[in-house]
Amino acid sequence: MSPVPPIRVRALTAAPTRADGQYVLYWMTATRRLERNHALDHAAQLAETLQKPLVIFEAISAGYRWASDRHHQAILDGMLEHERVLASKAVCYFPYVESKPGAGSGLLSTLADSACAVITDDSPVFGTPRLLEAAARL
């Protein structure tokens, strides 16, 4: 794993890293892969620097405008693969599939409360900008 170029890192808030947190939280949203993923690499590097565990949180929401069975199946297949690959790694993988719209409301905030930092993907497409705006308000 090579260092993440600074141009690939953007702080959403001025909040400092909390060294007393329990873990570094990587919230997987747009870049749903384990390789060639700058945000995941950055989270892993921060966890190593802080000597804290890395928690990878990957969620799928039930009720958003572009939800479709085909898209969700691709995400679910990826989640199963991530679970398989990460089972032998020194990380905690937390996949979450929302059972009904709104059921996962507050979950990210709860996880963030115990985290040293929350690292996530940054992408100008799909719903990512709105997700990041909401996360910055946590």
Show the residue positions of the predicted features.
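Trp/Phe/Arg-rich N-terminal binding region typifying the photolyase-homology
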Residues: 1-138
